[in-house]
Amino acid sequence: MTRIIGGVAGGRRIAVPPRGTRPTTDRVRESLFNIVTARRDLTGLAVLDLYAGSGALGLEALSRGAASVLFVESDQRSAAVIARNIEALGLSGATLRRGAVAAVVAAGTTSPVDLVLADPPYNVDSADVDAILAALGTNGWTREGTVAVVERATTCAPLTWPEGWRRWPQRVYGDTRLELAERLFANV
């Protein structure tokens, strides 16, 4: 079990998948949201939670005032845990899409998001994550001002952000590195 750190559901526990996931620690999640909320008010934002695992990142965003979160998870067991966590917390604005992150992002959207949270398994190659970041911009997911946060192992190669993103300072917590960037201009 892990818990929601802040907002209306702060302190409430959520389930985590039994195997095969690496939930973001409370310390890293709290730091991530402190970094983002120092620059952005989450109230009313649209959020995309990629490689959602237990849904902890997206649920934290909803608890802190985000209007909507689209959770994307390919593993059926993890997706079932996310669905149970959404129901248990009773937070509105949550949508769960089961499927491979690359396929969902490639399908595109007409509703860009304000915040992208991505916590890919550490064994996902950095080049694959780079491709997802590029596809976010070309498939309508981002707009000027969209912030993206990617959690990686410190042993993983640093990400190569596509043109049009301004990197924020990365943060390291033990074996975890947070890479952050802001979209400078609208999709082309």
UniProtKB/Swiss-Prot annotation:
Q: Enumerate the GO terms in the molecular function aspect.
A: methyltransferase activity; nucleic acid binding
Q: Which GO terms describe its biological process?
A: rRNA methylation
Q: How is it modified after translation?
A: Glycosylated. Phosphorylated. In vitro, is phosphorylated by multiple mycobacterial kinases (PknA, PknB, PknD, PknH, PknJ and PknL) and by mammalian kinases.
Query: What does the UniProt record report as the effect of altering R3A in this chain?
Result: Does not show any significant binding to either DNA or RNA in vitro and lacks m2G966 methyltransferase activity in vivo
Means of activity regulation: Phosphorylation stimulates DNA binding and DNA methyltransferase activity, but does not influence secretion. Exists in a compact, folded state at both pH 7.5 and pH 4.0, the acidic pH that mycobacterial proteins may encounter in the host lysosomal or endosomal compartments. The protein is more compact and stable at pH 4.0 than pH 7.5.
- The ranges of region (Beta-hairpin) come to 1-16
UniProt keyword list: Host cytoplasm, Host nucleus, Methyltransferase, rRNA processing, S-adenosyl-L-methionine, Secreted, Transferase, Virulence
Outline the segment boundaries, as ranges, of region: SAM-MT-fold: 25-188
Q: Which domain of life is it from?
A: Bacteria
Reactions catalysed according to its record: guanosine(966) in 16S rRNA + S-adenosyl-L-methionine = N(2)-methylguanosine(966) in 16S rRNA + S-adenosyl-L-homocysteine + H(+)
Gene Ontology terms: cellular component: extracellular region; host cell cytoplasm; host cell nucleolus
Which EC number(s) does the record attach to this protein? 2.1.1.-, 2.1.1.171
CDD domains (alphabetical): AdoMet_MTases (cd02440)
Task: Region Linker: list its residue ranges.
Answer: 17-24
Summarizing the annotation, the consequence of altering R13A is:
Does not show any significant binding to either DNA or RNA in vitro and lacks m2G966 methyltransferase activity in vivo
Report the subcellular localization: Secreted; Host cytoplasm; Host nucleus; Host nucleus, Host nucleolus
The answer to keyword Methyltransferase applying to this record is: yes
Q: Which family does it belong to?
A: Belongs to the methyltransferase superfamily.
Extra notes? Can complement rsmD-deleted E.coli cells.
Kindly state the subunit structure of this protein. Monomer. Within host cells, interacts with histones H3 and H4.
NCBIfam families per the UniProt record, alphabetical: 16S rRNA (guanine(966)-N(2))-methyltransferase RsmD
Q: What does this protein do?
A: SAM-dependent methyltransferase that binds both to RNA and DNA. Specifically methylates the guanine in position 966 of 16S rRNA in the 30S particle. In addition, can methylate and modulate host cellular DNA within an infected mammalian cell, altering the host epigenetic machinery. Binds to specific host DNA sequences and methylates cytosines predominantly in a non-CpG context.
**Swiss-Prot/TrEMBL domain comment:** Forms a two-domain structure with a short hairpin domain at the N-terminus and a large C-terminal domain with the S-adenosylmethionine-MT fold. The N-terminal domain helps target recognition and is important for binding RNA and DNA substrates. The C-terminal residues dictate the nuclear localization.
Q: What is this protein called?
A: RNA/DNA methyltransferase Rv2966c
Question: What taxonomic classification does the UniProt entry list for its organism?
Answer: Bacteria, Bacillati, Actinomycetota, Actinomycetes, Mycobacteriales
